[in-house]
Amino acid sequence: MPSFTLIVPTYNAGTARWNEWFHAFQKQTNQPSQLIIIDSSSTDDTRNIASTYTNNIIVISPSEFNHGGTRNKALASAEESDFVVFLTQDAIFENKNALEEILSLFNDKNVAAVCGRQLPHHDANPLAIHARNFNYGTETLIKSKNDIKNLGIKTVFMSNSFAAYRRSVFEALGGFPEHTILAEDMFMAARMIQAGYKIAYCAEASVRHSHNYTPRQEFQRYFDTGVFHACNPWIQRDFGGAGGEGFRFVKSEIQFLLKNAPFWIPRALLTTFAKFLGYKLGKHWQSLPLSTCRYFSMYKSYWNNIQYSSSKEIK
C-alpha cells in the first residue's frame, strides 16, 4: 500500500476542537506512515495534546509562520513517502474513510493533487453553510489543461484545509512558494496543470471545516486574496479571473437565503461589498502604505519582510 505523510500546522488549536480532531483521526481506516505537527509556539495545550499521538512536533515562532514555507519546512523533515496530505487543525474528518478515498484518486498516475470536500461545521451560520455547499459539490472531478476553457480559474481550485499531493511531483516542481500571503495550494495546483498533470476534487473524502467570518474579516481575507493575485499575475493570465464565478456565487447566495434565512440578506450584501472592496484594494497593494496593508490584512506577520518592486512580484 502506498505510504503517506500527514502534516498539520497548528496554533492555539483549542482543547475541545483539537481533541475532536484526534478522535476523528483515530477512526480513519487508512493511517499515515508519519504524522507531523508544526506548531507556531501555541500558548494553550495544543502541543501537549498532540504529543499523545505523535513525537513529530516541530515548534516555530509565530513570526516564522508562512502558509507556503511552513508546510515546506514540515515536509522537509519527513520520512520518505509516496504522498503528502495537508490538513488544518479545525478540519474534522466527517467519514472514517476520508483519507482512503482522497488517496484513491492517485490510482490515475497523471493525478498530482487532490482536495477533499468541506462541509460546514455544525455551528456554521447561513453564509458559511451556503459557501461550503456552493464551493464543494457532491460530484468527484478530475481536471486538466483541457478544462481551462470551461472552468477557468476553477480548474486550479485547491484547498490545503484538506488536500493530498503526489510527493514526487510536488518536490520536482519546487514545493509551495516560500513566502506567500495565502493560496499556496492554488499556486501549486496551477504549476501542476501547467506541467501537464491533472488535479482532482474528491467528493467522497469529507471534513467539516468552515468559518463564521464577520464582514470585516471577509474584507481582510479578500484583501489578502487580491494581494496574492497581484503578486502572481500569471495565474489569472493563464487561467482567467473569478468575476463570473463571483456573480454566480452572489446570485446563489441570495436564492439560498431567501429560502432558508431571509433576515441574513442584509448581512450578505454587506459582506459582498466588503469582499469586493478588500479584493480591489489588495490588487493595488503597492499603491498603499505598508502600515495600511498590514492593517487591512488578515495575515499581519506577512508584511514584516516585504519589498516593493515595479513588477508587483513579491521579492
Swiss-Prot record:
An MF annotation (GO) of this entry: glycosyltransferase activity
Record field: catalytic activity: alpha-D-galactosyl-di-trans,octa-cis-undecaprenyl diphosphate + dTDP-beta-L-rhamnose = alpha-L-rhamnosyl-(1->3)-alpha-D-galactosyl-1-diphospho-di-trans,octa-cis-undecaprenol + dTDP + H(+)
SUPFAM superfamilies given in the database record: Nucleotide-diphospho-sugar transferases
Pfam assignment, any one: Glycos_transf_2
GO annotation, biological process: O antigen biosynthetic process; single-species biofilm formation
The entry's keywords: Glycosyltransferase, Lipopolysaccharide biosynthesis, Transferase
EC identifiers of the protein: 2.4.1.377
Coiled coil among keywords: no
InterPro entries tied to this protein: Glyco_trans_2-like, Glycosyltransf_2, Nucleotide-diphossugar_trans
Superkingdom field: Bacteria
Keyword Transferase annotated: yes
Pathway: Bacterial outer membrane biogenesis; LPS O-antigen biosynthesis
Described function: Rhamnosyltransferase involved in the biosynthesis of the repeat unit of the lipopolysaccharide (LPS) O-antigen region. Catalyzes the addition of a rhamnose to the galactosyl-undecaprenyl diphosphate intermediate.
Family statement: Belongs to the glycosyltransferase 2 family.
Protein name (record): O-antigen chain rhamnosyltransferase WbaN
